[in-house]
């Protein structure tokens, strides 16, 4: 199923998902440093593997995907399948509503 078929995202629910599943490795605040994963500020419209100052895997650089709702929705289902060789160890979010919620939060918090 695609992002277009997903339930409407709830940014508040997405914030809880981010804090419990993503914040250990990622930040969203403008100017915040990188952790184990890159800072996600400015994520939408950016090409994978291009955040300044973060050491990406060759897989992320070579995938050259533009991060938008559709690509993130597919990526977050199974990151290692979407970008084989990625350094991201997170196994993914299987529930469509969780992915939609997280994307709603990321859209609001990384702009």
Swiss-Prot record:
Q: Which residues carry this modification: N6,N6,N6-trimethyllysine?
A: 80, 94
Is Thylakoid a UniProt keyword of this protein? no
The UniProt entry's GO CC annotations, sorted and at most eight, read:
mitochondrial intermembrane space
Q: Where in the cell is it found?
A: Mitochondrion intermembrane space
> What processing steps or modifications follow its translation?
Binds 1 heme c group covalently per subunit.
Against PROSITE patterns, the record matches this protein to:
CYTC
Pfam families associated with the record: Cytochrom_C
- Residue positions annotated to bind heme c are 22, 25-26, 88
Keywords, in A-Z order: Acetylation, Electron transport, Heme, Iron, Metal-binding, Methylation, Mitochondrion, Respiratory chain, Transport
Q: Which residues carry this modification: N-acetylalanine?
A: 1
Quote one Gene Ontology molecular function term: heme binding
Q: Which InterPro entries match?
A: Cyt_c-like_dom (IPR009056), Cyt_c-like_dom_sf (IPR036909), Cyt_c_1A/1B (IPR002327)
Alphabetical list of SUPFAM superfamilies matching this protein? Cytochrome c
Role played: Electron carrier protein. The oxidized form of the cytochrome c heme group can accept an electron from the heme group of the cytochrome c1 subunit of cytochrome reductase. Cytochrome c then transfers this electron to the cytochrome oxidase complex, the final protein carrier in the mitochondrial electron-transport chain.
Which family does this protein fall into?
Belongs to the cytochrome c family.
PANTHER family documented for this protein: CYTOCHROME C
Q: Report the protein name in the record.
A: Cytochrome c
